[in-house]
Swiss-Prot record:
Domain HTH deoR-type: 1-57
Function statement: Iol operon repressor.
Pfam family membership, one: DeoRC
Name used for this protein in its record: HTH-type transcriptional regulator IolR
Protein's UniProt keywords contain Transcription: yes
Organism whose genome encodes this protein: Bacillus subtilis (strain 168)
Lineage top rank: taxon: Bacteria
Residue ranges of DNA binding: 19-38
Keywords: DNA-binding, Repressor, Transcription, Transcription regulation
Family annotation (PANTHER family): HTH-TYPE TRANSCRIPTIONAL REGULATOR IOLR, HTH-TYPE TRANSCRIPTIONAL REGULATOR SRLR-RELATED
GO aspect biological process, one term: regulation of DNA-templated transcription
Length: 251
């Protein structure tokens, strides 16, 4: 248990760059003394170093800024989003996740469609506000500049009142074992609740997201209704999807 916690703590620090002791206490539900002991182990390993009030990653693997992530596999991401828009139907209530893949999904949406969109993405908010037939519902209390998303909710259970037909989700990584994962605790709360509530969950992910996982699993792989991606999946994914009636669409 202790070794697993230390490993997860290392992954969390590496993905976030710099974190406070208080944040680590909250995320891992342990005391400051326990966090300090775990940090000492990680500093001995050479993965992190102490800074005032917290720790920072020595390795340059912190969460990549939104602008840089947009550049990575940009053509693939745009094609995936444009393809996925065909699944949005008249009178749907859909959730559109934040992320560099989902952000272009409204570019090719038929403007005549009457759709209610629930989102925490600044890019989706901006795009939806230009479409006259869109009913827009914004969630999240605080704006996170690095991911261009609104995060945190006083009561995540408030999402339960929405009958969401389809959720178009992004992920930092996905595997059959760990499912759909991300690295941010505040984003995780929204993603998890939405994935549990939505009738159909669509994963929009370019080829680089498969076969890797990060700290937090917000949905198991078998929760998916459909995957929209850019390249054929490995045989293990294809077989699993066939066995669990998960659709695979190549953009």
């Amino acid at each position: 248990m202790k070794l697993m916690r230390i490993q997860e703590m290392e992954e969390y620090i590496l993905s976030h760059g710099t974190v406070s002791l208080d944040e680590l206490c909250q995320v891992f539900n342990v005391s400051k003394n326990t966090v300090r002991r775990d940090i000492n182990k990680l500093t001995e390993k050479g993965a992190i170093e102490k800074v005032y009030g917290g720790v920072t990653s020595i390795e340059k693997t912190a969460l990549v800024p939104f602008e840089n992530r947009t550049i990575q596999h940009q053509d693939e991401k745009t094609k995936i989003a444009h393809y996925a828009s065909r699944f949005i139907e008249d009178h749907d209530l859909v959730f559109i996740d934040s992320g560099t893949t989902t952000k272009s999904i409204l570019d090719t949406l038929d403007p005549a469609k009457n759709v209610t969109i629930l989102t925490n993405s600044l890019d989706i908010i901006n795009a939806a506000s230009a479409l006259k037939n869109i009913n827009l519902i914004i969630i999240g209390n605080n704006y996170k500049r690095k991911t261009r998303s609104f995060v945190g909710m006083d009561d995540p259970a408030m999402l339960d009142k929405y009958n969401i037909n389809k959720a178009f989700m992004s992920a930092t990584g996905t595997t059959l074992t760990h499912g759909l994962t991300n690295s941010d605790l505040l984003e995780y709360e929204i993603k998890k609740r939405i994935s549990e509530k939505a009738k159909e969950v669509y994963l929009l992910a370019d080829h680089s997201k498969f076969g890797k996982s990060t700290l937090l699993t917000y949905a198991p792989f078998d929760r998916l209704h459909c995957i929209v991606t850019s390249q054929p999946l490995d045989d293990e994914y294809t077989q699993y999807c066939n066995e669990h009636q998960i659709g695979i669409h190549l953009a």
